[in-house]
Regions:
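Non-transmembrane alpha-helical segments in soluble domains
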Residues: 33, 37, 57-60, 122, ...
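GST-like fold's C-terminal all-alpha helical module
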Residues: 66-182, 189
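Solvent-exposed, charged interface segments at domain starts and junctions
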Residues: 1-13, 166-185, 189, 247, ...
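GST-like domain detector, emphasizing the conserved glutathione-binding G-site
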Residues: 1-94, 104, 233, 240-243, ...
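Catalytic cores of secreted or luminal carbohydrate-active enzymes
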Residues: 169-226
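Acidic, Ser/Thr-rich low-complexity intrinsically disordered segments
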Residues: 207-251, 255
Length: 292
């Protein structure tokens, strides 16, 4: 749905979550996680060896770019009484976001294809990383970022109450995939136990948070600028940034102030520094205004 709280701080990006630290706003979960890992190195969940870091990065891309999430969406139980299909405003909004309209007929037609692709994903985890009976992907004592990056679409399908019966039981069950089902259950248990140890978050409304972000006097993070970039962008140029996979209409405009191979930062009209990953995001020069 439209994001008035994000519009309030000059961010046209539509996806959530985002993270704000002072006057810095970080978009996309992958960038948020890497930023938190850098800020709190003593509490990191990152793998300890270069090879395992590489495996974790591959999982980070696999669940999104590898089609796992796309095929999980095809399995949404559209037939339920409280299904998203009953909300016309939501359907209209998602059509703008994703470029296609969700219908019962279309959802039903897509289920066999979604199930077939997900069976491949279930098979992969069951017969490789989890095959030896380990608790976690990298055989760690606790879940690592590799587990977080790998598990979330499976957790959504298997434990979210709104996704109940999304997976046909004859193809997806604990007898056929005992190790994967046990892994997801372990992760959910660990997640719930960790939540119990944390203080209860203080929920604030969007206007309050927007004002806090805009009014903060904390100096924004400094990101270097790669002048020798492949696009020939110059520091200080006006640009627009948008996702390149879906949600391309959610553009965020501003002045280009930071650029590396992995990250781009703009200063928007509210004076906020908005950070995006380079992967799956497009940078375009802002249209020049004609002079009369």
């Amino acid at each position: 749905m439209p994001r008035p709280d994000l519009e309030l701080i000059g961010v046209g990006y539509r996806k959530i979550p985002i993270m704000a630290i002072g006057k810095d706003v970080y978009c996309d979960s992958r960038l948020i996680i890497s930023t938190l890992e850098s800020l709190y190195p003593n509490n990191t969940l990152s793998p300890s060896t270069p090879a395992n870091v590489g495996i974790r990065k591959l999982f980070e891309s696999w669940t999104i770019d590898g089609g796992i999430f796309t095929n999980a969406v095809k399995m949404m139980p559209y037939w339920q009484e409280a299904s998203f299909l009953s909300n016309e405003a939501f359907i209209d909004d998602r059509q703008k976001l994703m470029g296609r309209r969700f219908t019962a007929q279309g959802m039903q037609a897509g289920r066999p294809e979604g199930a077939q692709h997900l069976q491949q994903a279930f098979d992969l985890l069951e017969t490789t990383f989890l095959a030896d009976g380990r608790d976690w992907i990298l055989n760690t004592q606790e879940p690592s970022l590799a587990d977080i990056d790998a598990v979330w679409p499976f957790k959504w399908l298997m434990s979210d109450l709104k996704m109940k019966d999304s997976l046909p039981a004859e193809h997806f069950n604990a007898k056929k995939y005992p190790k994967l089902f046990a892994w997801v259950e372990r992760f959910v248990t660990q997640l719930n136990e960790k939540k119990e140890t944390l203080p209860k978050p203080n929920a604030l409304d969007g206007k309050t948070m927007g004002k806090r972000i805009i009014d903060t006097t904390t100096a924004p993070e400094t990101i270097p600028f790669d002048d020798d970039n492949s696009h020939g962008f110059k520091q200080g140029e006006g640009v627009e940034i948008s996702p390149s996979d879906y949600g391309q209409t959610g553009k965020t405009a501003g002045t280009l102030i930071g650029l590396t191979v992995h990250e781009v930062v703009i200063r928007n009209s509210k004076g906020i520094h908005v950070h995006f990953p380079r992967w799956n995001f497009a940078i375009s020069r802002a249209a020049s205004k004609s002079k009369i």
